[in-house]
C-alpha cells in the first residue's frame, strides 16, 4: 500500500515522522506520539495511544518505525479519498442542499442516469437506507449505505 505514494508524499511523511520521533532513534513511542497529538490539540489517554501504535505496529515491538508509519499514512489517505467521494455523491442526490435525500430527489437523480423507477421502487430504496424512519436519507444513513457496498 505504501508503494502507491509519490516520492513527494514519502518525503513529506519522512518530515512528519521526524517531528514525532523526538529523540531521532527511528522509532515513535507512545510518549512521543502523545506529545505530538497534544501539540495538535488532541488529548489521547495512554491506552488510546497504545491502541494507535498497536494498530500499525507490524513487528509488535511497541513502537512505530518509518515503514509502519508510511503504511498508516497510505491507509489514512485512502480512507480520506473515499470519504470525500461519498460526500460528493451525497451532494449530487441532495439537490436542495438541506442535508437530506428525499424520494423526489432520489427519483430525479435515478431518472437522469437512465434508471426509470416506479414510486414503489423509490420508496423501497428510501426504506432500506432510512434508519430513523423519517422517510428520507440523511448523510449518516447515506454513508452507512455506501460502506455496505
From Swiss-Prot:
Ca(2+) 1 binds at residues 21, 23, 25, 27, 32. Residues 8-43, 44-79, 81-116, 117-149 form the EF-hand domain. Pfam families: EF-hand_7. One of its GO terms (molecular function) is calcium ion binding. The modification N-acetylalanine is found at residue 2. InterPro entries: CALM/Myosin/TropC-like, EF-hand-dom_pair, EF_Hand_1_Ca_BS, EF_hand_dom. GO terms for biological process: microtubule cytoskeleton organization; spindle pole body organization. Ca(2+) 3 binds at residues 94, 96, 98, 105. Trimethylation of Lys-116 observed in other calmodulins is absent here. One of its GO terms (cellular component) is cell tip. Ca(2+) 2 binds at residues 57, 59, 61, 63, 68. Ca(2+) 4 binds at residues 130, 132, 134, 136, 141. Keywords: Acetylation, Calcium, Metal-binding, Repeat. Calmodulin mediates the control of a large number of enzymes, ion channels and other proteins by Ca(2+). Among the enzymes to be stimulated by the calmodulin-Ca(2+) complex are a number of protein kinases and phosphatases. Belongs to the calmodulin family. This protein has four functional calcium-binding sites. This is Calmodulin.
